């Protein structure tokens, strides 16, 4: 068996894992351990096409999950074929512009950037430490892949906020972006789709899932993106508000008497589609009930969501200027599967000569890729499934094999 990469994506209460062959992209194992620290902590997986699941035990967390993977899921052949471990890291700050092998200095850098990703980076560090314990023979073969790295090519006019400059120089307050691994992968897929070298492609990429972001790519490099200092800025998301007037925070604090913790919870966990529907953060609910007059919240939510998305796409078309836009790409759970969201958003952009093909759009869902605009559309819109795990596996292999 060829050299394989174990991929870990640690959240505060969950752990996604996979084993890939970086040379072929073949997935040997995928799974999710979830409900950490709760009585119902559990793990589910698919190994060589066969599904399995198990209880991890009340209160189980990252340690128990990784030990279970190593001891109960992996057979000897698969375990012996794992030659390196790749970790997804949400925030690398300004320091990291590419993937690196884990060292004490790198761990310190991830800790320093945790102030901008307090829910994610500490969990990633737990994953790294537990991987060292579960696979001690691979301690020098752990690689971190940063979601912020792809966006580090943004020019100053894109990443600076109009705040006192000292906040940037002394405290690192600037736009960093997120979902960079996905944006990188899809930008390369666009290049292949339109028959251009990756370093010549110009694209607008819409990664739409429970979290969502848009980036604009010129000559293969990111020049702007919608998420900011944290993943709260930008698009309407599942539970996150995206762009708002910053003075709303003052109003909630001073006039409504909300604490800063309550305000943070409102903006991060109670807003977005959940806030607009007052029912759910699931886009499918809004899509399925869009025309139901007894549920006006669904149309309200989806219209706000798609309008915000269209504004970003239109703005980024302007940012490209004279550089020809090769394609608008949709990816992520909503981007790949919600024909309705794509159509609502693109219909706002008819001024640019974009014409969506209704039948193509409906046919391009559930893992299918393809062009969803008409042949005479001024610009192509394409659906392209993302594969962040493959990027992590390939980056890890480059550094370790």
UniProtKB/Swiss-Prot annotation:
Named in its record, the pathway it takes part in is: Metabolic intermediate biosynthesis; acetyl-CoA biosynthesis; acetyl-CoA from acetate: step 1/2
Which chain positions carry the site (Transition state stabilizer)? 179, 240
Q: Which GO terms describe its biological process?
A: acetate metabolic process; acetyl-CoA biosynthetic process
Q: Which residues bind ATP?
A: 16, 207-211, 282-284, 333-337
Identify which residues the record assigns to the active site. 147
Say yes or no: keyword Transmembrane helix present: no
Give residues annotated as binding substrate. 88
Q: Name the chemical reaction catalysed here.
A: acetate + ATP = acetyl phosphate + ADP
Which EC number applies?
2.7.2.1
Report residues binding Mg(2+).
9, 388
Q: Where in the cell is it found?
A: Cytoplasm
Tell me which Pfam families the record gives.
Answer: Acetate_kinase
Q: Which InterPro entries match?
A: Ac/propionate_kinase, Aliphatic_acid_kin_short-chain, Aliphatic_acid_kinase_CS, ATPase_NBD
**One MF term in the entry's GO annotations:** acetate kinase activity
Describe how the cofactor binds.
Mg(2+). Can also accept Mn(2+).
Q: What does this protein do?
A: Catalyzes the formation of acetyl phosphate from acetate and ATP. Can also catalyze the reverse reaction.
Assembly description:
Homodimer.
The record's annotation in NCBIfam families points to: ackA
Protein name as catalogued: Acetate kinase
Record the organism: Haemophilus influenzae (strain PittGG)
Q: Which gene encodes it?
A: ackA
């Amino acid at each position: 068996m060829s050299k394989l990469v174990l991929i870990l994506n640690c959240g505060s209460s969950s752990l996604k894992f996979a084993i890939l062959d970086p040379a072929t992209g073949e997935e040997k194992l995928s799974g999710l351990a979830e409900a950490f620290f709760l009585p119902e902590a559990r793990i589910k997986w698919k190994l060589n096409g066969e599904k399995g699941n198990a209880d991890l035990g009340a209160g189980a967390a990252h340690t128990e999950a990784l030990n279970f993977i190593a001891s109960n899921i992996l057979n000897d052949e698969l375990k012996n074929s794992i030659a390196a471990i790749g970790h997804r890291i949400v925030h690398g700050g300004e320091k990291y512009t590419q993937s690196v092998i884990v060292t004490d200095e790198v761990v310190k850098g991830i800790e320093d950037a945790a102030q901008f990703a307090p829910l994610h980076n500490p969990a990633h560090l737990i994953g790294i430490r537990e991987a060292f314990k579960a696979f001690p023979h691979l301690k020098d073969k752990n690689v971190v892949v940063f979601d912020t790295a792809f966006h580090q090519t943004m020019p100053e006019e894109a990443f600076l906020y109009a705040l006192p400059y000292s906040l940037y120089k002394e405290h690192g307050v600037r736009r960093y972006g997120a979902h960079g691994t996905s944006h990188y992968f899809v930008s390369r897929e666009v290049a292949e789709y339109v028959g251009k070298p990756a370093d010549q492609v110009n694209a607008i990429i819409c990664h739409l899932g429970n979290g969502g972001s848009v980036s604009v790519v010129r000559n293969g490099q990111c020049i702007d993106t919608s998420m900011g200092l944290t993943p709260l800025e930008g698009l309407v998301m599942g539970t996150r508000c995206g762009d708002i007037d910053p003075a709303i925070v003052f109003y909630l604090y001073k006039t409504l008497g909300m604490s800063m913790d309550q305000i943070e919870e409102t903006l991060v966990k109670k807003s977005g589609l959940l806030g607009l529907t007052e029912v759910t953060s699931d886009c499918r609910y809004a899509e399925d009930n869009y025309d139901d007059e007894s549920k006006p919240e669904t149309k309200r939510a989806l219209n706000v969501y798609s309008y915000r998305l269209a504004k970003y796409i239109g703005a980024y078309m302007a940012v490209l200027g004279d550089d020809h836009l090769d394609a608008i790409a949709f990816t992520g759970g909503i981007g790949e599967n919600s024909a309705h969201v794509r159509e609502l958003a693109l219909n706002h952009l008819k001024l640019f000569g974009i014409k969506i093909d209704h039948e193509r759009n409906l046919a391009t869902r559930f893992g299918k890729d393809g062009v969803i605009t008409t042949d005479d559309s001024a610009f192509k819109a394409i659906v392209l499934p993302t594969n962040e795990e493959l990027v992590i596996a390939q980056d890890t292999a480059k550094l370790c094999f």
